[in-house]
Structures are given as structure tokens and as C-alpha cells.
């Protein structure tokens, strides 16, 4: 039974599927106005791992992740640079998917663009007005938040508590709103801005209206899981859900949010704070798998600090895994060790506990190396288990090695000597490899040799 923390209920509970054997997931995608940062990378990697694991267990996953291709930030950049807004969104979307490809993030099943669903958004807003849950002002159309009785479910605050605390409320149209928490469903356009026709005047949809329409249009009511970063919980996801409630439509059954990427001071990285680390820089200078491995070693709900130390450590660990893959590539056809796979499923089924599952992976690599050293027939099952876990993680191993077999054998002998606490032999083997021009690095996955 797969269990996940549900933001709405504040508990780890079973992910109950609307249709047995099938999972419908909506992930809020990027607003394409600039390069992706590490926070974007974390969100897409977390949910890529989730998707891969669910498919690994035999479920059919439909992952919908949108592209917000019309937004105030896009318009602002277009105006600053005197460029067509479509040129900016097209280029930034291409950069986004190029980065996701390098991270080995699989393309979502569906990639809806907000501009493709404007007609449906207009229809939804019209329905909200007809139901008395939205109203027209001089600058747009707003949802009447007090008409949503359980507003604040995801934030775990009542509307009164939000207002008394200041809250993170929408500034747009502050002078025209009936209530401070009301938010824009439709924004009337200014001269020169992109716009679409509506019964109330030309304009564009509000951000919160885009995702609720796309998710319900593609996945339908009562879809299984809505995902995104912790920063989207409020107000974006709260406001998405509020519109569905105001429409009288069932929305997501389960809510999942990943933690922040923080800087060295523990501060959340964001563009508004000016401490964003560009994901493209990381991908240019490091093995892209290193970021995935660092995130696997951190629980998805916990904050993660990304620095040169933990990226370097991940690169070294990957080297050990690659050496193991090269050493064991001759073993084919074995069935994965049942005990290992059972333990793996137990940890992953418990709120996607990738840190424990990753520890199990390294433990299995060590056991497999020892079995290979001893020509133990159990080696095949352990090797197959390692491959299976890496498949579920989306962690590709570089099995084609440029390291000669005799060098790999000497590295394995070094590991065997260390395991036997025969450090004199281990040191001698290390010195001999170094004398032959090899860089020798040892970590918890074993010894890596490279030029």
C-alpha cells in the first residue's frame, strides 16, 4: 500500500486511486520567462522519481504538467526587452525541456499550455459569476473568497486568521476588491498587452485560474494527486482549490508538496530574494545525475542545501556505482534478490522514503561487490536488485567503461582488502594504481578509478 503525506489532512495516508491500476497526477509546471533554477529542478526531479517508482510497481501513470505561457512576469520582460512575448516563452520553454532532458526527467504525458485553454477559462469564470461566486470590477473579475467555506484548508488557517496575520494576499486590484482575500480570475488588458476576448472585456486569465481549468479538463474531477513546491501551497494551490469548490466540482483527492532548496544560510532560494542558483550552471559543470542523487538522499518534504561539497560527494559516489556497473555487466538474466526488493518497496511505500531506499541501494552494492569477490552465486540476484532500484530512481548507470578489466579487478581487490581490514595490501594496491596513472577515489559504494 503506497502512502503519502497529504498536505490537506497533515497525515501520511494511502493514496487512494479513482481508477484501480491508474494514477492521475497534476504538477504545476514552469512560468517560462527565465532560466530554470535549482528549485525548479528539485520539483521536477521529485515528481519524476515518484512517477518512475509508481510505474515500476506496475501502475499506469498519467502525469500532466503545464506550461504557463502568459503571465505578468512574461509581459514585464517582453516590455523591458522590447521583444514579442511569444518569443520569450518559446525560447524559455525550449531551455526548460533541454535542462529536463539533461536531468533525465521524462517528459510529462500531457504538457498543456495556458494559452490553449483560455476559452475554457472564460467559460469557467462565467459559471462562477452565474453562481454568485465571482464579480466584475473596473480592472477584472474576482473570486469572492468568503463564499468558499473551507478556504484555508491547505494553509491550515481560517480566513480570519490569514487576514489578522497579514498573509500572502494578492495585491492586484486591491482598491476594487470586495474582500482583501479575493483574487483575480480575469485581468483586463492595458494597451499593447496580449489579450483575449471575454464577455466582460478583453484581457487575460489570472494565474490561479489557469491550472484549475487545465487539470480538470484533462484529468477530470476527483483526480488522484496534485503536486508542486511548498511555495505553491498558498496562495496558488489554495486558490485553485477554492475555484473548484465555488464551482461545485470535486478537485484533487491528495496534495503533495516538496520542500525548498535553501542557500548556505538556510534561506529559501527564490528569484525575489535574489539568491537563485541557475540550474543550467550546475548542469554545465557537473554530472547531471549528481543533483538527482543528492535529492534522493534527502526526504522530499525536507529542505535541501545544494553546495559544492554535497555535489562533489554525489559525483564520487556515482563513480563508484558506475565502476560497479562496469564490473558486473557480464551478469545477466538473474532475478532480483527478493528480500532486497521487498525492503525497497517497504521504504518507498512509506511516504516516498528515498533516503532509506538509497541507503539500501548502497548496502546492496557493497554486498554485491563482496559476492563478486567470492564468486558467490548470490551475486547475480544482488546485481539485478541494484539495477532494478536504479531503474525506479531514474538513476542511469554508465555501464560502458573505458577502464580496462584488469584495472577494475585491482580496484575490487583494493575494496576486498579494506573490507578485511588488510590496510597494508589496500595501500599497496592503491599506490600501484596511482603509479600507473590512475586517479583512485574510495567512497561508500566502493573504489573508483579514472584518468
Show which residues each predicted segment covers.
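N-terminal, positively charged nucleic-acid-binding surface of large information/translation enzymes
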Residues: 9-14, 18-106, 449
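Anion (oxyanion) recognition and catalysis
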Residues: 55, 129, 434
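Alpha-helical recognition segments enriched in aromatics with Gly/Pro capping
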Residues: 1-33, 48, 97-98, 119-329
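Short Gly/Ser/Thr- and Asp/Glu-enriched loop/turn motifs at secondary-structure junctions
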Residues: 107, 137-138, 442-446
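Short phosphate-binding/catalytic loops that engage adenosine nucleotides
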Residues: 59, 133, 438
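Phosphate-binding beta-loop-alpha motif at adenosine-nucleotide cofactor sites
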Residues: 108-116
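Structural preference for alpha-helix termini/caps and helix-kink/transition segments
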Residues: 267-270, 275-451
Amino acid at each position: 500500500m503506497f502512502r503519502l503525506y497529504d498536505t490537506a489532512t497533515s497525515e501520511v495516508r494511502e493514496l487512494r486511486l479513482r481508477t484501480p491500476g491508474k494514477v492521475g497526477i497534476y504538477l504545476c509546471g514552469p512560468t517560462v520567462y527565465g532560466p530554470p533554477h535549482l528549485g525548479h529542478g528539485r520539483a521536477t526531479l521529485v515528481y519524476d522519481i515518484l512517477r518512475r517508482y509508481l510505474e515500476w510497481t506496475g501502475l499506469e501513470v498519467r502525469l500532466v504538467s503545464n506550461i504557463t505561457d502568459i503571465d505578468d512576469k512574461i509581459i514585464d520582460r517582453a516590455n523591458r526587452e522590447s521583444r514579442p512575448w511569444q518569443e520569450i516563452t518559446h525560447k524559455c520553454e525550449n531551455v526548460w525541456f533541454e535542462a529536463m532532458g539533461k536531468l533525465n526527467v521524462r517528459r510529462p504525458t500531457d504538457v498543456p499550455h495556458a494559452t490553449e485553454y483560455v476559452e475554457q477559462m472564460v467559460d469557467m469564470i462565467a459559471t462562477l459569476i452565474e453562481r454568485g461566486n465571482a464579480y466584475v470590477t473596473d480592472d477584472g473579475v474576482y473570486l469572492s473568497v468568503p463564499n468558499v467555506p473551507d478556504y484555508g484548508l491547505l494553509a491550515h488557517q481560517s480566513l480570519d486568521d490569514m487576514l489578522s496575520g497579514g498573509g500572502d494576499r494578492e495585491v492586484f486590484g486591491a482598491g476594487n476588491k470586495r474582500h482583501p482575500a479575493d483574487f483575480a480570475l480575469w485581468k483586463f488588458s492595458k494597451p499593447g498587452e496580449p489579450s483575449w476576448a471575454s464577455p466582460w472585456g478583453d484581457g487575460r486569465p489570472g494565474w490561479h485560474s489557469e491550472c484549475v481549468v487545465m487539470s480538470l479538463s484533462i484529468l477530470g474531477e476527483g483526480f488522484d494527486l496534485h503536486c508542486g513546491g511548498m511555495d505553491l501551497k498558498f496562495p496558488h494551490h489554495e486558490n485553485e482549490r477554492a475555484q473548484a469548490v465555488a464551482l461545485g466540482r470535486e478537485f484533487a483527492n491528495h496534495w503533495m508538496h516538496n520542500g525548498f532548496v535553501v542557500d548556505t544560510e538556510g534561506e529559501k532560494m527564490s528569484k525575489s530574494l535574489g539568491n537563485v542558483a541557475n540550474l543550467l550552471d550546475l548542469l554545465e559543470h557537473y554530472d547531471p545525475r549528481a543533483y538527482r542523487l543528492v535529492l534522493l538522499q534527502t526526504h522530499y518534504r525536507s529542505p535541501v542545501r545544494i553546495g559544492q561539497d554535497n555535489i562533489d560527494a554525489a559525483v564520487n559516489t556515482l563513480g563508484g556505482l558506475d565502476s560497479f556497473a562496469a564490473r558486473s555487466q557480464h551478469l545477466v538474466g538473474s532475478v532480483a534478490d527478493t528480500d532486497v526488493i521487498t525492503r525497497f518497496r517497504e521504504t518507498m511505500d512509506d511516504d516516498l522514503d528515498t533516503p532509506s531506499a538509497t541507503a539500501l541501494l548502497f548496502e546492496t552494492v557493497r554486498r554485491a561487490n563482496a559476492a563478486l569477490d567470492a564468486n558467490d552465486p548470490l551475486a547475480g540476484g544482488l546485481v539485478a536488485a541494484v539495477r532494478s532500484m536504479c531503474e525506479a530512481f531514474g538513476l542511469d548507470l554508465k555501464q560502458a567503461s573505458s577502464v580496462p578489466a584488469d584495472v577494475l579487478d585491482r580496484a575490487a581487490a583494493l575494496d576486498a582488502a579494506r573490507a578485511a581490514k588488510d590496510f597494508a595490501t589496500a595501500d599497496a594496491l592503491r599506490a600501484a594504481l596511482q603509479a600507473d596513472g590512475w586517479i583512485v577515489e574510495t567512497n561508500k559504494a566502493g573504489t573508483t578509478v579514472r584518468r
